[in-house]
Amino acid sequence: MIFLLLLLWLIPVVVAVISRRYARPSLWRNTGIAFGLVVSPATLGLYALYFLGPIAALLGIVALPLHLLHGSPGYELAVRFGLVPSHTVVEGFMHLPIEAINGVIWSIVYGLVGWGIDAFGKSKHHGQSTTA
C-alpha cells in the first residue's frame, strides 16, 4: 500500500511532461492541478517511510508536517459534513471522503498558483520584442 501511495508522485510528473509537449501555455496550471489532486495521500505514503529504516525515516520526518498541512482541511470538512465521525481514528475506507475533499481543495489552490505562474510567464514573454 505504501508503494501505491508513493507512485502517486508520478502523476504530476507525467502531466508536466505531457503538458510541456502538447499544452505549453498551461504547463504550470495543469501540473498544479495534478499535484493538488495527489499531494495529501502522497505525503501520507511519504510519511509511512518513517517506519522502514533510518535513511527512509528522514523523508518520513519531512513528510509529517506536510501531511498535517495538507490533510487537515479535508478532515475538518468531512467531519462538518458528517462524512466522518469526529473524535475517532481514521482508518481504511474512512480516508476516501477526506482525501476526495483534500483533492478538490488542493487542486484548486495549486492550480491557481500554477495559473499565476503561467500568466506571469505570458506577460514576461509578451513584453519582449520578436524583431531581431
Segments the model singles out, each with a brief description of its role:
Residues T31-G36, G114:
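Periodic glycine anchor positions in long extracellular repeat architectures
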Residues F51-F81:
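Juxtamembrane non-transmembrane "cap" segments at the membrane-aqueous interface
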Residues L4-A23:
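N-terminal signal-anchor/start-transfer transmembrane helix
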Residues S19-I33:
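Membrane-interface helix-boundary motifs at transmembrane edges
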Residues V104-A132:
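Cytoplasmic juxtamembrane regions at transmembrane-helix boundaries
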Residues M1-L8, L58-L68, M94-V104:
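Alpha-helical transmembrane segments of polytopic membrane proteins
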Residues F81-V109:
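Individual transmembrane alpha-helix segments
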